[in-house]
Amino acid sequence: MTPTAVPATPTEIPATPTPTETPATPTATPVPEVDWYQAMLDRSVMYKGNNARLKKVIEKARSGETVNIATLGGSITEGANATPWTLGYAYRFAEKFAAEYGVNGGENINYANAGIGGTPSALGVIRYERDVVEALGAEPDLFVIEFEVNDYAEATKGRAYESLVYQVLSQSNDAAVIMVFAVRSDMWNVQDEHYPIAIRYGIPVVAIKNAVEPAIAEGQLDKNVFFSDEYHPTNYGHDIMSDCIMQMVRVLDTAEADEMKPLAEKAIKGRNFVGTKMIDSATEGIAIEAGAFTKVDGEIQRFSTKMLPSFPNNWMHDGAAGNDSFKMTLNCKNLLMNYKTGSGAFGTAEVYVDGKLVKDLNGAGGWNNSNVVLLIDEKEAAEHVVEIRMAEGQEDKAFTIYAFGYTE
């Protein structure tokens, strides 16, 4: 497998244990030969969907053609609490896929991990072009999407998620999509919200809750062995997740081929955010007056996988430059804004659209993490003026605008 802009193959590969019928231990490695383990993998295959696209990807891989795989999601996809991160489920899946279906050790498989902790699909749709297509140098052939524990109260109410799925399926390369429904340790996620989207487009669904909840309840799998905290798997849990995705791939690989079907004409949530474009301070051709937001914030959220800043071309008000407004004039239908919540002296900014106050955004109380809000949501494109300034009494506080995402 050829990673794209990611570290080299991990050096800590878990040893294969002797199969056992006893529950897992903290040092255990997944053992597919054991009945309860295989039953868990079988349960993870929530919905097989239409297999035509995935079969095409598998055939490309086997024939030696280049196959580009991308994963997009939150911290679980990023590899949080896997040590090292290359033992996270996303990288492990790409590794296993490359070994099983690629040629010459998977040299024809390229992979990009676009997970960022604490982020919803509304930020994913902003980042797709940069962090998936540009990172790979091509559109993905296989796209794995995971936002199940991050999309609670998501700004677009599911439309960004469906837009991402539809955008990938609409590519000229007949790309395949796999939805991964991760789960918190309390067995909560938003899979009931996203599952209808899978049905509408015939997308395979791997449901981790369906897999592990019965195993935990029956004492076959220790919850504290699978989960490292409330949200994130251990190395062992990440490897189980990767095995669940591989189970889906193997099931569809051996199934009778489906006929490729045209994309559904009617959306479930909405496709308003297909083709979303990112705006940051390096973007040209957008009318922006930075006002007092002229600094660059260096204390920002990073990609754990690459240790690179997630939004380096930001606009920061540092509390010492006055209170001149940030102004942007833009022709758009939809506009998303991504701002930072940080520790220390961060304050509240007011956001105006066409002179009307639409948001009060508190930039304090976070860990440099991203927060996405929807500022404009229209059916037709029109010229809008967006103005951002510190709230009264907050002029000496800091506030950082990470980026915007818009549709034309």
Language-model segments: what does each one mean?
Residues 2-31:
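Ser/Thr-rich, Proline-interspersed low-complexity disordered segments
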Residues 31-114, 129-138, 327, 335-337, ...:
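Serine-esterase "nucleophile elbow" of acetyl-processing enzymes
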Residues 83-84, 232, 274:
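Short, conserved micro-motifs enriched in small and acidic residues
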Residues 94-108, 119, 123-261, 317-321, ...:
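Alpha-helical cap/lid subdomain in secreted, periplasmic
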Residues 114, 291-296, 335, 361, ...:
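Generic beta-strand hydrophobic packing signal
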Residues 254-329, 338:
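Glycan-recognition and processing domains
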Residues 332:
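Contiguous, non-catalytic segments that form substrate-binding/exosite surfaces or channel walls
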Residues 395-408:
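Extended, polar beta-sheet/loop recognition surfaces of beta-rich domains
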